[in-house]
Amino acid sequence: MLVWALCFWTLAGCDSYLDVNPKGTLEQEKQFEDVQGYRDAMYGIYATMAKTSLYGEALSWGFVDWLAQLSYDKYMQSEKLVNVKAANQYKYDDPNLEGLIGSIWGEAYQCISYANNVLENIETVNLAEDPDYALIKGEAYGVRAMLHFDLLRLFAENILLHPDAGGIPYAYHFDLKNKEVFSLKESYDNILGDLTKAEACLVNDNEMNPSNAGSDYRVARG
């Protein structure tokens, strides 16, 4: 009887065991049930953007400096030196850069996907309930624009030299479907569109952006 009781208890507890979320994760309905959930989602995006494959190194002072030939040290470890030399010569297909470039591309689109998840869920929210909703929405648009812009400038042609060239996939939705690849001009237009939406949402955010002169200049240049 004891054995059967133990088996019944184990099987009965199976469903509740499987319902337990991994540490640091929440079901989507719970994640976005209040403004704090949206804040936490944005914190998660920023934490991912701070990884060494993105703005924690590669897109701040690592890979981008190698491309600009601003980083060369004869005392650098040999395994890193071959990466630097390949980047100095813009050899994107060099096997030594394959892992790093794959990480930049993959992590950036992961963050874009997270931003899209925030944007899709926040569409169901009454923004008047809390002023932070509009700010969060603006931040998500800004993140999406910024990441696409950096991918475009790193992995696409110079629009001034090749205006009709192909651009990059521009991700608007939180799903696993293949994303549409836009032309270079269309890609930049998409970025400017997201920046315009971000600016409208952040119009009351005077703490971080007391002047719109910089963004107005960039849009005018586009």
What are these regions (language model features)?
Residues 14-64:
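Membrane-proximal, proline-rich intrinsically disordered regions
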Residues 131, 154-189:
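Short coil/linker segments at helix-helix boundaries
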